[in-house]
Design a protein with these regions (language model features):
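Non-catalytic surface loops within mature trypsin-like serine protease
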Residues: 10-12, 58, 92-95
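An amphipathic, aromatic/His-enriched active-site/gating alpha helix that lines ligand/cofactor pockets
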Residues: 24-36, 55-88
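Glycine-rich beta-strand-turn "strand-cap" elements at beta-sheet edges
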Residues: 39-48, 76-100
Length: 100
């Protein structure tokens, strides 16, 4: 499994628009081969941070996302709203179990 976590900040007034943009792209991203999850979170610690958590089958299935129209569109909309550089952390992970 491949996990990518993206954190970025916007002005407080821009965060709803940033969240809306990511929600707009969610369906297309979830439909991509190998995507297991795409979750967007507004920080409870402040009014400017947004976190996106991606889960993919593997790193190879993540790569087409980086070249996708959804990624490009979101970048065009989100980057001007960002008040600093985004931070993307990427992990290889092994699922041990799913407990329901």
């Amino acid at each position: 499994m491949f996990i990518a976590i993206l954190d970025f900040q916007t002005a407080a007034a821009d965060r709803p628009a940033a969240l809306a943009q990511l929600e707009t792209e969610r369906g297309q991203i979830r439909a991509m081969p190998g995507n297991l999850a795409f979750r967007v979170y507004a920080s409870r610690e402040d009014d400017s941070t947004v976190t996106v958590v991606h889960e993919w089958q593997d790193e190879e299935s993540f790569k087409p996302y980086l070249a996708s129209e959804a990624f490009i569109r979101s970048g065009e909309v989100l980057r001007p709203m960002m008040t600093g550089s985004p931070v993307s952390r990427r992990f290889h992970a092994e699922l041990l179990e799913t407990v329901a």
